[in-house]
């Protein structure tokens, strides 16, 4: 990613400004995506102590070579071979913050109690301090998400022509996940959803061994990851020629999704964004069949802020990347969902995925 050192310095300064605003002397960061955002460290274990003068990453022997390479000058790196909690305690005592913020949504009560026992610092719970900063993406982050979306779409385009009679949902998922990896996806941000026929009425169906059947719909929800950043895309296709009901439901979802991705703006609330699609689907008689929110933030995590939901009153910030994914789910029949990734730029929404939602009818 471009100029990681400069970006990390800017992010550190933003966290310090939040600490000063909230009356905190330092922050203990335990959530790994937050640590990666601040330092570039991609390991599976570590804690980060953030203060006005700098940051200290404490991790274990497994990352003795990796951590310094990834972090560079963004933070001091401490490799602790035996007792990371004790080494963290010594680092806090050396910094001597009067008040130490902790990520209350990450640390367990037991971990927080152990940490605070014997510390002179007053331990203060915080909520989503770093996550709120992460909602606003810089150019390099947007580029990574766009790249992830592009390779995801290339993978799907390669796999759809291979879908054949006798395939199981899990066969399609396996070929898609292989195609994603072969095109450069670092990992699958979530288990690929391939749901056919009546199973597509389950928004988060677990991919099964059910065989695909001509005349049904096939819902595919999948993602890719580039430089740690996620794309999240859903397409629904017909297995053979679509019938009138399938076309009607599909078109309702397609129109609602297009209106939403074109009408969403930074500065509106998550509730207002959700209402664009929800009102259209409700007006067509399917409001009760659209039971989930319109979308969510996207970045280092596949589900992050901001929320696009009927109960979300927070304002969508300039620079956020969100999914737009309305759906209609009819038990016993199936479901349709269409999902694209949208960047809320200052001058309006910009698609990061291709937005191609013409109904595809596979020759099964």
Predicted feature descriptions by range:
Residues 1-364:
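Active-site neighborhoods and metal-handling regions in enzymes and metal-associated proteins
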């Amino acid at each position: 990613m471009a100029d990681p050192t400069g970006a990390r310095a800017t992010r550190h300064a933003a966290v310090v400004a939040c600490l000063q605003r909230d009356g905190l002397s330092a922050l203990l960061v335990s959530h790994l995506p937050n640590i990666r955002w601040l330092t570039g460290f991609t390991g599976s274990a570590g804690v980060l102590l953030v203060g006005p003068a700098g940051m200290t990453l404490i991790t274990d022997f497994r990352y003795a070579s990796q951590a310094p390479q990834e972090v560079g000058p963004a933070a001091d790196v401490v490799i602790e071979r035996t007792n990371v909690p004790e080494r963290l305690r010594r680092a806090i005592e050396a910094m001597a913050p009067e008040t130490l913020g902790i990520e209350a949504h990450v640390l367990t009560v037991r971990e927080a109690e152990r940490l605070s026992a014997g510390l002179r610092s007053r331990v203060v719970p915080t909520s989503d301090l770093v996550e709120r900063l992460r909602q606003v993406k810089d150019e390099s982050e947007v580029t990574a998400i766009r790249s992830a979306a592009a390779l995801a779409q290339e993978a799907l385009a390669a796999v759809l022509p291979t879908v054949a009679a006798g395939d199981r949902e899990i066969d399609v998922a396996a070929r898609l996940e292989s195609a994603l990896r072969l095109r450069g996806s670092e990992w699958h941000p979530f288990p690929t959803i391939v749901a056919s026929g009546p199973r597509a009425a389950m928004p988060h169906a677990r991919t099964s061994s059910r065989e695909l059947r001509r005349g049904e719909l096939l819902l595919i929800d999948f993602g890719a990851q580039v430089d740690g950043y996620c794309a999240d895309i859903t397409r629904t296709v017909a297995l053979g020629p679509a019938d009138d009901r399938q076309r009607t439901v599909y078109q309702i979802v397609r129109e609602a999704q297009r209106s939403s991705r074109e009408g969403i703006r930074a500065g509106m609330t998550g509730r207002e964004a959700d209402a664009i699609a929800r009102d259209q689907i409700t007006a067509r008689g399917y409001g009760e069949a659209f039971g989930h929110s319109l979308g969510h933030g996207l970045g280092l995590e596949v589900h992050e802020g901001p929320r696009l939901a009927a109960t979300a009153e927070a304002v969508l910030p300039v620079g956020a990347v969100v999914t737009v994914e309305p759906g209609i789910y009819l038990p016993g029949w199936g479901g349709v969902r269409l999902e694209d990734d949208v960047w809320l730029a200052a001058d309006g929404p910009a698609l990061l995925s291709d937005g191609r939602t013409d109904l595809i009818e596979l020759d099964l």
